[in-house]
């Protein structure tokens, strides 16, 4: 018993915090009108992001060499259906279980509006209503306030998962 306990304790020291809770960005597979791609992003700027304003699709910051705090999700928690923005310790949450629901940020409490899962087709759907997928707005991108070229933004919502929306509903992660 003591050997097992010693192995468990030792394993905690061998796993660094960065390995246990590594940040990844979640990006749309289709780059749409920005070659840098679109990532799930907190509205606002990096560490000054305004969590009360919710989520959007925004130019991925990884082209700058690292994942931005307002786009960094806890990779370990993603495997447990929790979409936690590591730097803010806050969860992605749907505003409702109905089509066109917005994405907001709330304290993580594992309620049904916070449980999302990846499908085999690279779609992110709400477990409480598996017909709804995380979707980037099909309209024209809006210009942001920074970047060169200027960063682009689009709205995010939950829409019916359909093949015709694949370019706006298929996602992946990267370090």
Locations of regions flagged by a protein language model:
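Sec-dependent N-terminal signal peptides
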Residues: 4-14
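Generic detector of N-terminal low-structure segments
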Residues: 14-15, 75
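Lectin-like carbohydrate-binding module/patch detector with strong preference for beta-trefoil
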Residues: 20-175
